[in-house]
Amino acid sequence: MCIRDSVKTEAEAPDFAQWQTALNAIMPAGIHVTRVAPVEMKADSIAFACYCISYPAAAAAVLEQYNALETAPVEKHSKRGKKIVDLKEHIPQLRYTALGDTVQLELCLPAAQELNLNPSLLTGFLEEKFGLPAASANILRTKFLTADRQLFV
């Protein structure tokens, strides 16, 4: 998972490797800090969040059914209320790879102030429309991108 967090320090030259070691010592099992670094960009420059979603291999048929749809309307809830968003405008096709007993897809969704789409909108839609349990999805956020699709650091 990709999480961005910030801390303030009075140290003039913080030892980020030491921070990483200390953080890893207190992380829950299975969660590892892979990078500690000074902030280079402001959070408001994030425009997309990218994910790797895996399902059991049998889900491939459902992903193909999604690909055949012309529209995929979902109701998005936010602080500003509810609105209908067509997932096909943001995810026209689900391109996936079969890996053993799973299928894996990678996608980037809007993650800006104006529009922020969570992958649970897709997994919920696939469950509601085709019966593919959302709980069978393994969702991993892998990175953030800026509006020009550069890696957010």
Region spans (language model):
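Short beta-strand-to-loop capping motifs
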Residues: 7-13, 53-59, 107-113
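Short, glycine- and charge-enriched coil/turn segments that flank and shape catalytic ligand pockets
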Residues: 13-14, 60, 98-102
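Core RNA-modification/binding signature centered on pseudouridine synthases
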Residues: 68-153
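Broad hydrophobic/π-residue packing in well-ordered secondary structure
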Residues: 7, 49-51, 94
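Conserved small/polar residues in nucleotide/adenosyl-binding loops
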Residues: 1-5
